[in-house]
């Protein structure tokens, strides 16, 4: 009992919560404490602390990011291709190597990419069974382009004007030129040509490699796709004139390709057996072709405009022709073989040991078949004919026309040689 009483005496009463006394100075001075000094209770926090918003991850600048801008629209009335000289709408592939990714970038062009080209007119409007599969809209675009080209070119150049432009574009006068290589006339080259035309009336184009086998096609595509006019040609060097009424501020919109699209899959060039021959005859011909005397040796990135006439002349005496292409890339001499097959024409026998072996065929009758001649007269011929009638000088007109001594393939174009006009201008 005594122990219990002692414990009760020692027990202290519970503490009362202390009452906070406010200072009387608050009533005297009317001081209001700022919010930062006011104590916050747990109930005022809302039960959770507000977190700072996270920064968005860093995104490097990219040309694919349009930033909400609409897709580019071009009024050019032809299908956009990677190369206009090394690809043809008539070549039908058997497959694609990759999905149909547009080389112009996602959302950058209002034309769909079919894997081969970006057509100017919807391909679903074509009627494959009609005499003219091109729709009416496409024919109207071609007619509008022809009229616009005639308007921009204006009146034909006089011999003195042409001689002045040609001399101005020579290597001794300027280093500006556009190099046309194994890929031919590419789509982005059109933009480069218009950039040169911004400051100069004419631009020099240097052609080397595979496209020079068919120089007539190169000249035709340059004039057709750019709207200019070739006023001079010497070998693989071309002078492309923009026209009298060309306005750089009204140049066409040419969207650039951001990468080279993959080549589609085409049928095999070399079949197991040649058409019209048996398996044994095909093997014997391929062995025999490797021992035929070499017609010529191709240099890398050379000028091959004389190759087609040489093969045609060789077929007058020999049925097999061998062309040495050692040192050339495999894709180059295979493309050359395809061009020979279409231009000579002939049959490809083999590409073994970097040799192009072609056969003239069973039904060869010795006549030269030129599939590259065009029925339409070039604008340059019309201009020269008009100048001849005005001047009345027959000798002057005949000297202005000169065929390329290195190639007869492009003789149908009859590009003028301005050496006589240049010499007359210098003598004056």
Swiss-Prot record:
> What stretch of residues directs this protein to its organelle as a transit peptide?
1-21
The entry's cellular-component GO terms read: mitochondrion; ribonucleoprotein complex
Gene3D superfamilies hit by this protein: YhbY-like (3.30.110.60)
Polar residues bias (residue ranges): 394-413
Q: Which UniProt keywords apply?
A: Mitochondrion, mRNA processing, mRNA splicing, Repeat, Ribonucleoprotein, RNA-binding, Transit peptide
Q: Where is this region: Disordered?
A: 33-100, 129-152, 378-428
Q: Which GO terms describe its molecular function?
A: RNA binding
Residues covered by the CRM domain: 155-253, 275-371
| Cell location | Mitochondrion
Bias (Acidic residues) ranges = 380-393
Keyword check for RNA-binding: yes
Provide one Gene Ontology biological process annotation.
Answer: mRNA processing
Q: Which cysteines are joined by disulfide bonds?
A: none
Family matches, as PROSITE patterns: CRM
Return the PANTHER family for the record.
Answer: CRS2-ASSOCIATED FACTOR 1, CHLOROPLASTIC (PTHR46247), CRS2-ASSOCIATED FACTOR 1, MITOCHONDRIAL (PTHR46247:SF2)
Subunit structure as annotated in this protein's UniProt entry: Part of large ribonucleo-protein complexes that include group IIB introns.
What is the documented function of this protein?
May be involved in the splicing of group IIB introns in mitochondria.
Annotated protein name in UniProt: CRS2-associated factor 1, mitochondrial
């Amino acid at each position: 009992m005594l122990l219990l009483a002692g414990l009760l005496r020692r027990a202290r009463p519970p503490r009362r919560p202390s009452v906070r006394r406010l200072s009387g100075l608050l009533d005297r001075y009317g001081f209001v404490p700022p919010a930062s000094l006011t104590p916050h209770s747990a109930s005022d926090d809302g039960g959770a602390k507000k977190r700072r918003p996270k920064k968005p991850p860093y995104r490097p600048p990219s040309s694919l990011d349009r930033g909400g801008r609409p897709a580019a629209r071009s009024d050019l009335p032809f299908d956009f291709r990677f190369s206009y000289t090394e690809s043809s709408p008539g070549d039908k592939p058997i497959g694609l190597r990759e999905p149909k990714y547009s080389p112009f970038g996602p959302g950058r062009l209002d034309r769909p990419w079919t894997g081969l080209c970006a057509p100017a007119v919807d391909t679903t409007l074509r009627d494959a069974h009609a005499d003219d599969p091109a729709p009416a809209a496409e024919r109207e675009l071609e007619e509008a382009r022809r009229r616009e080209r005639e308007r921009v070119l204006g009146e034909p150049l006089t011999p003195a004007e042409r001689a002045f432009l040609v001399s101005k574009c020579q290597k001794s006068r300027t280093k500006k030129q556009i190099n046309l290589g194994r890929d031919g006339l590419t789509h982005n080259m059109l933009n480069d040509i218009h950039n040169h035309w911004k400051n100069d009336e004419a631009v020099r184009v240097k052609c080397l490699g595979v496209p020079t086998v068919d120089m007539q096609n190169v000249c035709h595509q340059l004039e057709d796709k750019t709207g200019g006019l070739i006023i001079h040609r010497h070998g693989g060097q071309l002078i492309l004139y923009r026209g009298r009424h060309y306005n750089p501020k009204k140049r066409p919109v040419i969207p650039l390709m951001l990468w080279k699209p993959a080549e589609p899959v085409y049928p095999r060039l070399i079949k197991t057996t040649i058409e019209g021959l048996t398996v044994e005859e095909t093997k014997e011909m391929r062995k025999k072709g490797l021992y035929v005397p070499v017609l010529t040796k191709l240099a890398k990135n050379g000028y091959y405009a004389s190759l087609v006439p040489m093969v045609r002349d060789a077929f007058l005496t020999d049925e097999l022709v061998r062309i040495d292409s050692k040192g050339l890339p495999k894709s180059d001499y295979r493309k050359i073989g395809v061009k020979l097959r279409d231009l000579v024409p002939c049959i490809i026998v083999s590409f073994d040991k970097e040799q192009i072996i072609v056969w003239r065929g069973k039904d060869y009758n010795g006549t030269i078949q030129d599939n590259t001649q065009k029925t339409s007269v070039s604008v340059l011929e019309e201009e020269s004919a008009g100048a001849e009638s005005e001047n009345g000088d027959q000798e002057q007109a005949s000297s202005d026309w000169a065929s390329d001594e290195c190639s007869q393939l492009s003789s149908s174009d009859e590009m003028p040689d301005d050496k006589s006009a240049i010499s007359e201008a210098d003598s004056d």
